[in-house]
């Protein structure tokens, strides 16, 4: 994988295909594999770039000066500068949508179009924030994601009726076990706290271009329920697409639907 040094740390990314650039922003706890079906489909017509989050996949640890989602947005702008890419079509899922929207607000001249999937620009509700922080404390104390937590954390990302013996579920569960102690303590846990203590920026959404923005959400997304996406789409004045038979990682649970929706949107805006 190619690498760019951003804020003193190696940021690894996929760069596949040619054409207008599509930048894919990943979910917390997932590497580039969460976009595998989209990379294959989109790279036939587009140049697809998929950076891996700090502490995830092959990327280095969270840079010391990373204190907010605005910093993540700035770091991804630095990646675009490194690659001499003036404008992108940005597709961000979960935290990828959180920093993606901030990038669009920070540098609107760099954005052709923006797709926010299974994400929310409001603050994390207090109950879920406290719950996630309690999980981070357990992970921190153990220096690993303990076995009992694997089947607490993994289901958060999928629709309720997912087959827990499926390759999709089991591969993700295995990937959670693979995080190193160093990676968890230096990057994954601090990044999680940063994500779930984010400030509310819903009042800024009206600044996004409604004609070149799309909000998408899995119909069965538990951590980011469709009501949040409906709220954001109304504030922006943009289209909303609900993804059937999908939870949080809709890109993997209903890839054909997601691919078709993205290709249709990009054909009109890229």
Predicted segment positions?
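Active-site loop/oxyanion-hole signature of alpha/beta-hydrolase fold enzymes
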Residues: 40, 49-92, 260
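Conserved alpha/beta-hydrolase catalytic His-Asp/Glu region
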Residues: 125-130, 145-207
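Short beta-strand/loop motif that positions the catalytic acidic residue
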Residues: 208-209, 215-217
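Conserved HGGG/HGGXW glycine-rich cap/lid loop of the alpha/beta-hydrolase fold
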Residues: 9-62
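Gly/Ala-rich beta-loop-alpha elbow adjacent to hydrolase catalytic centers
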Residues: 92, 96, 100
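Flexible "cap/lid" loop of the alpha/beta hydrolase fold
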Residues: 105, 112-143
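Catalytic active-site module of serine/aspartate enzymes centered on a nucleophile-bearing elbow/loop
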Residues: 237-270
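Conserved alpha/beta-hydrolase "acid-adjacent" motif
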Residues: 222-228
């Amino acid at each position: 994988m190619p690498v760019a040094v951003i804020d003193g740390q190696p940021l690894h990314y996929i760069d596949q295909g040619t054409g207008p650039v599509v930048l894919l922003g990943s979910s917390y706890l997932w590497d580039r594999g969460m976009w595998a079906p989209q990379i294959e489909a989109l790279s036939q017509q587009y140049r697809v770039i998929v950076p891996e989050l700090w502490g995830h996949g092959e990327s280095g640890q969270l840079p010391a000066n990373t204190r907010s989602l605005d910093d993540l947005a700035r770091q991804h702008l630095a990646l675009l500068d490194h690659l001499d890419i003036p404008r992108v079509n940005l597709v961000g899922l979960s935290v990828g949508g959180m920093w993606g929207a901030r990038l669009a607000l920070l540098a609107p001249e760099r954005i052709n179009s923006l797709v926010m999937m299974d994400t929310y620009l409001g603050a994390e509700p207090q109950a879920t924030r406290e719950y996630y922080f309690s999980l981070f404390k357990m992970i921190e104390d153990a220096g690993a994601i303990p076995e009992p937590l694997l089947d607490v954390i993994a289901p958060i990302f999928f629709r309720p009726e997912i087959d827990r013996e499926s390759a999709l579920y089991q591969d993700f569960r295995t990937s959670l076990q693979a995080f190193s102690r160093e990676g968890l303590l230096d990057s994954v846990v601090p990044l999680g706290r940063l994500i779930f203590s984010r400030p509310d920026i819903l009042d800024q959404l009206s600044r996004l271009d409604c004609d070149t923005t799309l909000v998408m959400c899995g119909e069965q997304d538990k951590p980011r329920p469709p009501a949040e996406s409906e709220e954001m789409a109304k504030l922006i004045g943009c289209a909303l697409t609900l993804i059937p038979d999908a939870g949080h990682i809709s890109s993997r649970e209903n890839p054909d639907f997601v691919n078709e929706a993205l290709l249709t949107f990009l054909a009109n805006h890229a």
